Amino acid sequence: MTEPAIITNASDPAVQRIIDVTKHSRASIKTTLIEDTEPLMECIRAGVQFIEVYGSSGTPLDPALLDLCRQREIPVRLIDVSIVNQLFKAERKAKVFGIARVPRPARLADIAERGGDVVVLDGVKIVGNIGAIVRTSLALGAAGIVLVDSDLATIADRRLLRASRGYVFSLPVVLADREEAVSFLRDNDIALMVLDTDGDLGVKDLGDRADRMALVFGSEKGGPSGLFQEASAGTVSIPMLSSTESLNVSVSVGIALHERSARNFAVRRAAAQA
């Protein structure tokens, strides 16, 4: 097995490319930095196109990552640890990372083509929560996620890539406004169910329904907006002790999707066999 070459010169074009990608003020985001072995491998499997993958010269690269890069013909090089330290002066120093081309943004039509339930996050802004919800939604068979008023300019945001462990490109995650989201759900006959503290239904009731749903979750402070409340086919609550004010939104999504998982898994199996 040939060892990756080591970049020892800070003037190497790859070093400047990394500097450019990590600038916070970029007007146009066409490439992004993806850090750590697991997110890199997940993004590669999801079909994200990588320009190159890098490792710090002081840390061995995972053989599984090297094999995957070789299979997909992705160049791999090491960077001298002193240069890595300069590249990531004021932030967490990545030991392995890659420069990737940002995929085409997912569209609502991409979600429509899939049969699973839709997760709508209305005003959820904490990136760590969004990342956890991405992973849970993928694991429990959701068709995709619609982010409304998330304050994210792109799903290629490095914070979201970290929080989702790279899974953000493995299912459609769409940025939309409230009107677009409601129109999309109506046009595709997807029943809109709002999670609320005083719901008409209990979360267990979700498992009894065979129709496709959009599960709407608001922020822990504000809850879902009036537009989603008005458009809803019903409201759903998660039983909990009265001494607990609320659940973390990522936990609520996990509970609701677990109740819907049998239905969503069946849809996924049927699509795979078609």
From Swiss-Prot:
This is 23S rRNA (adenosine(1067)-2'-O)-methyltransferase. Its EC number is 2.1.1.230. Changing residue 92 to A: Loss of activity. The keyword Transferase applies. InterPro entries: Alpha/beta_knot_MTases (IPR029028), Ribosomal_eL30-like_sf (IPR029064), rRNA_Methyltransferase (IPR051259), SpoU_MeTrfase (IPR001537), Thiostrepton-R_Mease_TSNR_N (IPR006795), tRNA_m1G_MTases_N (IPR029026). It comes from the Bacteria. Belongs to the class IV-like SAM-binding methyltransferase superfamily. RNA methyltransferase TsnR/AvirB family. It comes from Streptomyces actuosus. It holds the Pfam family SpoU_methylase. Keywords: Antibiotic resistance, Methyltransferase, S-adenosyl-L-methionine, Transferase. One of its GO terms (molecular function) is 23S rRNA (adenosine(1067)-2'-O)-methyltransferase activity. GO terms for biological process: response to antibiotic. Homodimer. Changing residue 220 to Q: Significantly decreases activity. Disulfide bonds: none annotated.
